[in-house]
């Protein structure tokens, strides 16, 4: 099912990825998208959202830094993208951390149809209404079944859910996959999850099967991080960051297939 050819489609087509994101990660997200062959646009003015929806191949909404004006822009952009039949991805950064974030995400989910939602276990648990001890924008700790959370949110919101962690879990409510690739250094650089959301968006833009696109994006991204770590003399985040960008720029179907670790995939019982 997963041949990782979506990666080549991204390189061939260069999808335009409209990002409404936060200032902490905007630069790395843009450079990461350029590295894989996509074309990023980082725009958040509500006055241009309707026009951008007609131009972009996918919209990625990231709630990392919120204010009222930005939330309004997100809603306008999401509705316009839905009208234009442009896929939309949500990264609910830190949704479990504050009541304001939870309120905003519930409003976004109510007004916009998302093709995919990507976050950590704590963020998706908050959306699912499951008990979880959030730690700011980090995953925190909890005992709930991550696969069950993914299935629940996917079914409730008719979307594909991508839960990042030591093992990534992807579900569309019917099908699921577990991915065990990835460098331990990824969580040590700010914005690695946000960039993954943007990368997932670029794959979704060129692949009709959103579940397949999401799995292949997660594997390809994680495998690139492993190749970057192999180049390190010392396993430090400052050295890893530019090597990871280089690994994204030089990734290939062959490299991904050689190291892909899909632990399990199939249909929910």
Swiss-Prot record:
The record's section on Pfam families has: HK
Task: Name the coiled-coil region(s).
Answer: none
Annotated transmembrane regions: none
Enzyme class name: transferase
Q: Which cofactor does it need?
A: Mg(2+)
Instruction: List the SUPFAM superfamilies hit by this protein, alphabetically.
Output: Ribokinase-like
Please indicate if the UniProt record lists Iron as a keyword: no
The EC code for this enzyme is 2.7.1.50
Please tell me where substrate binds in this chain.
Answer: 42, 191
Q: Which UniProt keywords apply?
A: ATP-binding, Kinase, Magnesium, Metal-binding, Nucleotide-binding, Thiamine biosynthesis, Transferase
Q: Which GO terms describe its biological process?
A: thiamine biosynthetic process; thiamine diphosphate biosynthetic process
Q: Which reaction does it catalyse?
A: 5-(2-hydroxyethyl)-4-methylthiazole + ATP = 4-methyl-5-(2-phosphooxyethyl)-thiazole + ADP + H(+)
Give the metabolic or biological pathway.
Answer: Cofactor biosynthesis; thiamine diphosphate biosynthesis; 4-methyl-5-(2-phosphoethyl)-thiazole from 5-(2-hydroxyethyl)-4-methylthiazole: step 1/1
One GO molecular function term of this record is: magnesium ion binding
**Where along the chain is ATP bound?**
118, 164
Q: Which InterPro entries match?
A: Hyethyz_kinase, Ribokinase-like
- Record-linked HAMAP family: Thz_kinase
Q: What does this protein do?
A: Catalyzes the phosphorylation of the hydroxyl group of 4-methyl-5-beta-hydroxyethylthiazole (THZ).
Q: Which family does it belong to?
A: Belongs to the Thz kinase family.
User: What is the protein named?
Assistant: Hydroxyethylthiazole kinase
Q: Which organism is it from?
A: Listeria welshimeri serovar 6b (strain ATCC 35897 / DSM 20650 / CCUG 15529 / CIP 8149 / NCTC 11857 / SLCC 5334 / V8)
Its lineage reads: Bacteria, Bacillati, Bacillota, Bacilli, Bacillales
Name of the coding gene: thiM
């Amino acid at each position: 099912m997963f041949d990782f050819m979506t990666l080549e489609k991204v390189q061939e087509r260069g999808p335009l990825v409209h990002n409404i994101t936060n200032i902490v990660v905007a630069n790395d997200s843009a450079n990461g998208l350029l590295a894989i062959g996509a074309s990023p646009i980082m725009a958040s003015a509500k006055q241009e959202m309707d026009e951008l929806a007609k131009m972009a191949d996918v919209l990625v909404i990231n709630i990392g830094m919120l204010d009222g004006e930005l939330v309004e822009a997100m809603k306008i952009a999401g509705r316009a993208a839905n009208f234009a039949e442009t896929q939309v991805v949500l990264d609910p950064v830190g949704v479990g951390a504050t009541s304001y974030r939870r309120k905003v995400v519930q409003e976004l989910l109510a007004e916009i149809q998302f093709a995919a939602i990507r976050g950590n276990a704590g963020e998706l648990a908050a959306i699912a209404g499951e008990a979880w001890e959030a730690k700011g924008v980090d995953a925190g700790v909890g005992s709930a079944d991550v696969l069950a959370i993914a299935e629940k949110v996917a079914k409730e919101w008719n979307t594909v859910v991508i839960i990042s962690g030591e093992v990534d879990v992807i579900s569309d409510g019917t099908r699921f996959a577990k991915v065990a690739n990835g460098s331990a250094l990824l969580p040590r650089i700010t914005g690695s999850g946000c960039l993954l959301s943007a990368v997932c968006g670029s794959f979704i833009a060129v692949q009709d099967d959103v579940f397949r696109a999401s799995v292949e994006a997660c594997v390809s991204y994680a495998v690139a991080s492993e190749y970057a770590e192999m180049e390190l003399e010392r396993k430090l985040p400052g050295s890893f960051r530019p090597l990871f960008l280089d690994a994204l720029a030089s990734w290939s179907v062959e490299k991904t297939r050689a190291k892909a670790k899909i632990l399990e995939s199939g249909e929910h019982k």
